[in-house]
């Protein structure tokens, strides 16, 4: 389940390394923020980007 409804208008900023349009997110999910590493796709709870960079720490 992805709480990020990316079909809505808005912006999803992933730290300072990524900005996604057409997305209304309070937290960056992989579905709207492609800067997350591919490994996060294996995370059951999804990928949440935190901080200024997106790395394996986004996996929860």
Curated annotation (Swiss-Prot):
Disulfide bonds: none annotated. A divalent metal cation 2 binds at residues 6, 12, 14, 25. Residues 29-60 are annotated as: Alpha. A divalent metal cation 5 binds at residues 33, 35-36, 49. A divalent metal cation 3 binds at residues 14, 18, 23, 28. A divalent metal cation 4 binds at residues 32-33, 43, 47. Class I metallothioneins contain 2 metal-binding domains: four divalent ions are chelated within cluster A of the alpha domain and are coordinated via cysteinyl thiolate bridges to 11 cysteine ligands. Cluster B, the corresponding region within the beta domain, can ligate three divalent ions to 9 cysteines. Belongs to the metallothionein superfamily. Type 1 family. PANTHER family: METALLOTHIONEIN (PTHR23299), METALLOTHIONEIN-1X (PTHR23299:SF24). This is Metallothionein. The lineage of its organism: Eukaryota, Metazoa, Chordata, Craniata, Vertebrata. The gene is mt.
């Amino acid at each position: 389940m992805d709480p990020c409804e990316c079909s809505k208008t808005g912006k999803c900023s992933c730290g300072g390394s990524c900005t996604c349009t057409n997305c209304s997110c309070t937290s960056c999910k992989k579905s709207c923020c492609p800067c997350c590493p591919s490994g996060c796709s294996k995370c059951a709870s999804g990928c949440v980007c935190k901080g200024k960079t997106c790395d394996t720490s986004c996996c929860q």
